[in-house]
């Protein structure tokens, strides 16, 4: 199969050969969903904190004597049963949200995503991508000429100028093939891959 070559003026050129084992697979929606959700979960860090009965600032004095008042017995006012008391199972920043996806499933999910992008015409190949200086304007003008506004760039050689020029563009992400993740692939409207990076992707996902 072939991926379309995107020229600097935004026109599509001749096709570039690509492996059908990576870019020609059937779309497995359930697997892609599982891989994306697992990626998001593994990137998540806990930021919720609630107090249990030990952490609540209350006196430990017994509110009233054990027997003889007619009330239910009570040990301390920090009890989870009381208003203002601690939580029984409080949320903690140390919670583990990670989900396990084995390598075989992850690679199959990535192949499915790349294949769907190829079918939808959202992935194109460029000979190379570089800028002469680490200037955001240079890269922004290049993408504007190509008709791109939201783009994930997968390059075989992430040089410093390209990285620095892309860093201040809100809807542009430049990565190497081994750092391309499922969430970014489905998030951006277009995916640009350099010719050399196509071979690297095929090697990673074979």
Curated annotation (Swiss-Prot):
GO BP terms in the entry: translation
Coiled coil regions, renumbered to chain: none
GO cellular component: ribonucleoprotein complex; ribosome
SUPFAM superfamilies xrefs: Ribosomal protein L4
Record-linked NCBIfam families: rplD_bact
HAMAP family: Ribosomal_uL4_B
Known partners and oligomeric status: Part of the 50S ribosomal subunit.
Family: Belongs to the universal ribosomal protein uL4 family.
Protein's name according to its UniProt entry: Large ribosomal subunit protein uL4
């Amino acid at each position: 199969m072939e991926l379309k070559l995107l020229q600097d003026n935004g026109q599509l050129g001749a096709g570039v050969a690509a492996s059908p084992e990576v870019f020609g697979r059937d779309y497995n929606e359930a697997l892609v969903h599982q891989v994306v959700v697992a990626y998001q979960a593994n990137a998540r860090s806990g930021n919720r904190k609630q107090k249990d009965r030990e952490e609540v600032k209350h006196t430990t004095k017994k509110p009233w004597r054990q027997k003889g008042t007619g009330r239910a017995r009570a040990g301390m006012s920090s009890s989870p049963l009381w208003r203002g008391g601690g939580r029984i199972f409080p949320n903690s920043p140390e919670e583990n949200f990670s989900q396990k996806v084995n390598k075989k499933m992850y690679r199959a999910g990535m192949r499915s995503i790349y294949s769907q992008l190829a079918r939808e015409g959202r992935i194109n190949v460029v000979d190379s991508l570089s800028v002469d200086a680490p200037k955001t304007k240079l890269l922004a003008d290049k993408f504007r000429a190509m008709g791109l506004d939201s783009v994930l760039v997968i390059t075989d050689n992430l040089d410093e100028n390209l990285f620095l020029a892309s860093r201040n563009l809100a809807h542009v992400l430049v990565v190497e093939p081994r750092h391309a993740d499922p969430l970014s692939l489905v998030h951006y409207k277009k995916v640009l891959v350099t010719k050399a990076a196509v071979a690297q992707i095929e090697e990673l996902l074979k």
